[in-house]
Each structure stands twice: as structure tokens, then as C-alpha cells.
């Protein structure tokens, strides 16, 4: 939820700042995209994207669009509240949490970023809010 997301990001930023370690911010949908893409009838390496969606009680459906090419995830549309009735095409997957697999992917992505010379500063890691806790802003 909203509060849990804020607390988790603040805790990660504080630990990275105080320990002087890099921090890589990746959305949970982007982490699961490579794993979930394997469930598609045809791998979307052709350039066509796919959607990951999650129903939020009393809020609607949150969705993000992704493309995976040789294991590299490209976020086409970040997770956001979808307009009711919006057509997403045929490649739509329900979000499926696998914390262990997604944490391993996050650590591998951080390691790859550091090998490539990226600094991964904690200051750039901010939460995303696909829905506003107070309504439209």
C-alpha cells in the first residue's frame, strides 16, 4: 500500500546513505516482467510489448507495459491506474509476486549496473504512486 511503499523506500534510502552503498530503484512490475514474459504464448522479442496488471480493491486496475529482449526489460509505460474499459490488447498478464526471484533479479541488476560503472546514488530512488491516496491531483 501507499504507506508501506513510502516506508520501504525511506528505509532503503537511509540504509544506503548511512552505509555508503549504492541503491538501485526498480519497480516491482519491472522486476517481474522478465519472469512473467516466459508465460506468454510467443516471447515478445519482436518488439511488441505486453501488460502486467493488478486489481486494487476500491481503486481499479493498475497496469504497466513492458518489452523484454534477451532478458533486458524495457518499461514502455510505468505502472499507473488504468481508465476503465481501456483495451490493452491480447498480451496481458496478472501480476504475480515471487519475492525471492525478484530480489535475486534486483541484486543481479545492481551488480550489472556497478560493473558497467553506474554509481546508483540513493538520492535518485523515489517511490512511484500509481494511484493517489487522496484522489486526483
What positions do the PLM features span?
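Oxyanion-binding and handling regions
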Residues: 24-137
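A short acidic, glycine/proline-enriched capping/turn motif at secondary-structure boundaries
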Residues: 1-2, 31
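DPxDG-like acidic metal-binding loop motif
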Residues: 2-21
Amino acid at each position: 500500500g501507499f504507506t508501506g511503499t513510502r516506508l520501504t523506500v525511506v528505509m532503503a534510502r537511509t540504509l544506503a546513505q548511512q552505509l555508503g552503498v549504492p541503491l538501485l530503484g526498480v519497480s516491482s512490475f519491472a522486476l517481474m516482467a522478465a519472469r512473467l514474459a516466459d508465460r506468454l504464448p510467443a516471447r515478445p522479442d519482436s518488439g511488441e510489448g505486453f501488460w502486467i496488471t493488478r486489481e486494487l480493491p476500491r481503486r481499479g486496475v493498475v497496469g504497466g507495459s513492458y518489452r523484454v529482449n534477451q532478458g533486458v526489460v524495457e518499461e514502455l509505460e510505468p505502472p499507473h491506474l488504468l481508465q476503465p474499459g481501456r483495451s490493452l490488447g491480447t498480451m496481458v498478464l496478472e501480476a504475480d509476486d515471487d519475492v525471492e526471484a525478484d530480489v535475486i533479479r534486483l541484486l543481479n541488476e545492481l551488480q550489472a549496473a556497478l560493473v558497467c560503472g553506474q554509481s546508483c546514488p540513493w538520492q535518485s530512488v523515489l517511490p512511484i504512486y500509481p494511484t493517489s491516496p487522496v484522489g486526483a491531483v
